């Protein structure tokens, strides 16, 4: 699968897209939210300023297991390093323990219906990050 990574930045968000070279369709999307508060309480952890967090990682079903999500995450890591941002990646509880995640079942169905797999604030993002850092 041939694809390239495209970065679109706005004042508050950074979108990382994976684009199929042949069809020019977007096969993956990652969104980073920048937050410049002096102190941010996130997941009960108080951290310093210049925090960025990944809001979601979405990949097309056809792109699953092809390294697309990892490529987008690698690009995200580069961006965080370039901006000297602190990335807050917190391991999440298992899905069964995560009430918030259970409520997202409707959203999961919505994405699956349109051929997307949706990861957000879930353990798999953390796992993929570790993989992206190690490679």
PLM-predicted stretches and their roles:
Residues 67, 84, 115:
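Short glycine-rich hinge loops at helix-strand junctions in the catalytic core
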Residues 47-48, 93-95, 101-108, 114-135:
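C-terminal "cap" of GNAT-fold acetyltransferases
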Residues 12-56, 98:
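Conserved acyl-donor/pantetheine-binding loop and adjacent beta-alpha core of acyl/acetyltransferases
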Residues 55-64, 93:
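A short, internal acetyl-CoA/4′-phosphopantetheine-binding micro-motif in the GNAT/acyltransferase core
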Residues 59, 65-78:
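Conserved acetyl-CoA-binding loop-helix of GNAT-fold acetyltransferases
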Residues 80-100:
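Conserved GNAT acetyl-CoA-binding A-motif
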Residues 1-9:
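Conserved N-terminal entry element of GNAT/NAT acetyltransferase domains
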């Amino acid at each position: 699968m041939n694809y390239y990574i495209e970065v679109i930045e706005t004042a508050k968000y950074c979108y990382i897209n994976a684009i199929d070279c042949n069809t020019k369709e977007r096969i993956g999307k990652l969104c980073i939210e920048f937050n410049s508060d002096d102190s941010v309480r996130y997941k009960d952890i108080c951290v310093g300023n210049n925090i960025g967090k990944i809001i979601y990682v979405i990949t097309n079903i056809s792109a699953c297991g092809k390294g697309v999500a990892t490529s987008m995450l690698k690009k995200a890591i580069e961006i965080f390093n370039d901006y000297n941002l602190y990335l807050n990646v917190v391991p999440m509880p298992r899905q069964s323990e995560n009430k918030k995640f259970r409520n997202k079942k409707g959203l999961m169905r919505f994405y699956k219906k349109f051929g997307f797999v949706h990861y957000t604030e879930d353990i798999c993002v953390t796992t993929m990050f570790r993989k992206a850092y190690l490679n």
